[in-house]
Amino acid sequence: MFIFSHNPGSQGAKNLAEAIGIRRVRHEGSRINLGPRDTLINWGSSRLPAHVAGAGRILNRPESVASVGNKLRFFERFGNACRTVPWTADRTVVRRWLDEGGNVVVRNVLNGHSGEGIEIIEGRGVDIPVAPLYTKYVGKESEWRIHVLNGRVIDSTRKIRDPDFTGQPNWAVRNHDGGFIYARNSGTPSEDVVRQAVAAVEASGLDFGAVDVMVDRRDGAAYVLEINTAPGLVGTTVTRYAEAFGNIR
């Protein structure tokens, strides 16, 4: 078993390789040339170079990684398989949402993560920026990261306020820069959160993924936000991934 990361400097891939005891394959200048008997963990790459593409078993095919990396494509292809927030690419729909008193999340970057390229607009007369994707804002009761491998949840963490953050927390966009982190021992995800996460990974054709799921504070419904195919891994999460991958080979 080998691992190839979209980012040569990925700390998560490095931590996982060390925990399993496998080699990371370099992007260039590698003497490794994988063949039919080899298994490759594809850590977030939508394209594989020739020296790894020949592996007999590739966990997370690059085409599946590409299909979830683009948020608009993800909503278009898999929105019927799991519950996602209401979305549109039509500014007429956005205007209706605003006129109804709702807020709208403008997504300027389709392949971003951690809140990159997000802008929230509200009010009936507000200008609507041109963007490739808009989602209806849903107030959060909680947000979870559910790690799924081969249809099974191997770990879960909840997003909480970072106790070491000294700035003003951003409750609308709960990312690291806004003062939030994922932590364990902060409750248990509901059955609906788990169900939506597993359904999203299975529908996408991925072997594994870290699914970000939010819970509506009004009715408790779980909504899939995105699937991470190269999540950051530390501590217990590294151990659980290593154990799960170790059971595959």
Where are these regions (language model features)?
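Protein kinase-like catalytic core scaffold
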Residues: V104, R152-D155, G209, Y223-L225
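Phosphate-binding site of ATP-dependent enzymes
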Residues: V105-D192
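Short glycine-rich anion-binding loops that position phosphate/pyrophosphate groups of nucleotides
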Residues: S45-R47, V109-N111, A230
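C-terminal active-site "lid" helix and adjoining low-complexity regulatory extension at the edge
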Residues: T188, E202-F208, V215-R249
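Short, low-complexity Ser/Thr-rich regulatory SLiMs
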Residues: V148-N150, V213-R217
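Short His-Asn-centered micro-motif
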Residues: H6, I41-G44, R107-V109, T135-Y137, ...
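A short, acidic, amphipathic alpha-helical segment used as a generic capping/interface helix at domain edges
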Residues: D192-E202
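Conserved N-proximal alpha/beta basic substrate-recognition cap immediately N-terminal to
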Residues: F2-E100
